[in-house]
Amino acid sequence: MMSNSLHDPVLVVDDEADIRDLMEMTLMKMGLRVETAVGVEDAKSKLDERDYSLVLTDMRMPDGSGLEVVQYINELMLDTPVAVITAFGNADQAVEALKSGAFDYLQKPITLSQL
């Protein structure tokens, strides 16, 4: 795969449609192209198909963890930055996410300035 660029869309991964839609709408208002995935397996499939400038992934989803998305990006040797987002965060989870390769760890609700 090619290197990611700002011309590539942002991938939003969240099992909750309301949150996914809100993040998509907010990012689109910022002038970004956005694609969404409903979980870990959907995200992996999309990552196989194209490059993304950024991946924003929920930490806890029914089919797995946002850390699995980070690990999959690492396995593909992509340089795509990943931010892990969660409503149930703690310091240990943040450290684990950052050690796995995420560039940021955000707690819901996230603000426009955080995006």
Each model region followed by its residue ranges:
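Active-site residues of response regulator receiver
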Residues: 14, 58, 86
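The feature encodes the CheY-like receiver
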Residues: 20, 62, 90
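Charged docking surfaces used in two-component/phosphorelay signaling
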Residues: 21-29
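Short hydrophobic/Thr-rich beta-strand motif most characteristic of the beta2 strand and flanking loop
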Residues: 31-40, 46
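Acidic catalytic/metal-coordinating carboxylates
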Residues: 39, 65-68
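Short amphipathic alpha-helix used as the core "switch/output" element in two-component signaling
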Residues: 45, 67-79, 96
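Active-site beta3 strand of CheY-like receiver
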Residues: 51-56
